[in-house]
């Protein structure tokens, strides 16, 4: 098929330029700083070590730029036309980019999302979103991060390990509020060890950038008022689908109650030939979900055999602080609301040989199953690089493997993944090493 991509700013998207990729580079530097700052004695390391955030920043940009160049290479290799500019629909079969008019048979809308702000809060030099912060080479002395989701927690980890005084304020009762409650507790404990101040159940009232400092006032769930003065504020309270400003209304495409583009299982909108993927659909605002949706949309347009994605709750999720968080499916609380008999199996990394050898005993593997059928309902991991372990669980869930079948899958010893095998055993009887 003859194919073109229209992009105004970030070839490769937010992920490659100011999101997933550069943040992982910064997190890797922060992990190394954490080892020297907190675990040097454990590993027999002594002496003075300095940490240059500017060098970490430069490395993150180099990594990002390299992958973006790879995107351009792949576009050229596959004969895809690149169109630089801002595209605006004039109808469901036409887009105008500056003076250029582009017609097509099919279109995939992948316009992403935009940062949500609290009412009354305005961005400024010192009140910023993730995009400005990840493109800033200098560190503040202190920062308030508003929102304890994945982005807020990842930035908190990086900045704290480079000596920034970090306070995280979350309106809901716990950090990572969409994760299992045990996960939230474990991460809150780890962050407090880092010296990060966490205020949950707390609503930000005002954010006042006074030039040399920012004053944040807040009220907790007991009605107590407080304030904090910092160098900078990072707003990370969530995202909204980007559906305005590019003529979507001229296409007749329907929106959901959340303001997202409504799609079916094949990413089709209500308008023939118009598809949508990614954050603009608000199914699950993660890069790998957008990629998976894109594959389904492309295969559908081409008339090729495809496989729909099913329940988006079963998509893998991760937060890349250390210890990392990785999960899929239902939390324990959600499972107990939906199923009459739920089994929970949990194995701590403190009882895992590889974790002990690595000095990475924080966290656990937790499995939630249907006690009547051994069906996997959810998996929740906290620990060193556990995001790499999650695909075993999501693959098993996708192909309807039970805990009993998974318990017979031999895991390499010694590996962190043996903790998952223990949860499989625990779900059907008893664990071996606990």
Residue ranges and their predicted role:
Residues 1, 6-139, 172-176, 181-183, ...:
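Glycine-rich flavin
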Residues 1-9, 14, 21, 25-35, ...:
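Flexible, glycine-rich terminal cap/loop adjacent to redox cofactors
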Residues 8-9, 146-149, 279:
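Glycine-rich Rossmann-fold phosphate-binding loop(s) that bind the pyrophosphate
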Residues 20, 111-165, 169, 197-198, ...:
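Glycine-rich dinucleotide-binding loop and its adjacent helix/turn
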Residues 87, 102-112, 145-146, 166, ...:
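Short hydrophobic core segments
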Residues 124-140, 227-304:
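FAD-site-proximal beta/loop scaffold in flavoenzymes
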């Amino acid at each position: 098929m003859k194919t073109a991509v229209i992009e105004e700013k970030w070839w490769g998207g937010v992920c490659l330029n100011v999101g997933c990729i550069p943040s992982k580079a910064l997190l890797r530097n922060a992990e190394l700083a954490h080892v020297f700052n907190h675990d040097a004695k454990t590993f027999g390391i002594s002496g003075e070590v300095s940490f240059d955030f500017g060098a970490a920043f430069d490395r993150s940009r180099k990594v990002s730029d390299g992958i973006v160049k790879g995107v351009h290479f792949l576009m050229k290799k596959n004969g895809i036309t690149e169109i630089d500019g801002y595209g605006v629909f004039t109808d469901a079969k036409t887009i105008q980019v500056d003076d250029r008019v582009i017609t097509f048979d099919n279109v995939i809308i992948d316009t992403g999302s935009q940062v949500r702000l609290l009412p009354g809060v305005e961005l400024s030099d010192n009140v910023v979103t993730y995009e400005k912060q990840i493109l800033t080479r200098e560190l503040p002395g202190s920062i308030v991060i508003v929102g304890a989701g994945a982005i807020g927690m990842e930035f908190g980890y990086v900045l704290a390990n480079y000596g920034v005084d970090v306070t995280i304020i979350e309106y809901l009762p716990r950090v990572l509020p969409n994760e299992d409650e045990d996960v939230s507790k474990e991460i809150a404990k780890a962050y407090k060890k880092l010296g990060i101040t966490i205020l949950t159940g707390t609503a930000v009232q005002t954010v006042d950038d006074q030039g040399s400092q920012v004053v944040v006032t807040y009220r907790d769930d007991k009605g107590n008022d407080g304030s904090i003065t910092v160098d900078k504020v990072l707003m990370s309270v969530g995202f909204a689908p980007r559906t305005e400003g590019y003529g979507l209304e001229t296409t007749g495409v329907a929106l959901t109650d959340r303001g997202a583009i409504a799609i079916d299982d094949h990413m089709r909108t209500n308008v023939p030939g118009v598809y949508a993927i990614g954050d603009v659909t608000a199914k699950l605002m993660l890069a790998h979900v957008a990629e998976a949706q894109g594959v389904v949309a492309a295969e559908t347009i081409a008339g090729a055999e495809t496989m729909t994605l099913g329940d988006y709750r079963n998509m893998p999720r991760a937060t890349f602080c250390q210890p990392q968080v990785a999960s899929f499916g239902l939390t324990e609380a959600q499972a107990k609301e939906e199923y009459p008999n739920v089994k929970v199996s949990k194995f701590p990394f403190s009882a895992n040989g590889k974790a002990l050898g690595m000095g990475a005993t924080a966290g656990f593997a937790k499995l939630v199953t249907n006690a009547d059928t051994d069906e996997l309902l959810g998996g929740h991991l906290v620990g060193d690089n556990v995001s790499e372990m999650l695909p075993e669980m999501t693959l098993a869930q996708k192909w309807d493997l039970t805990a009993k079948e998974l318990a017979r899958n031999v895991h390499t010893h010694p590996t962190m993944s043996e903790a998952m095998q223990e949860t499989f055993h625990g779900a059907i009887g008893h664990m071996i090493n606990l």
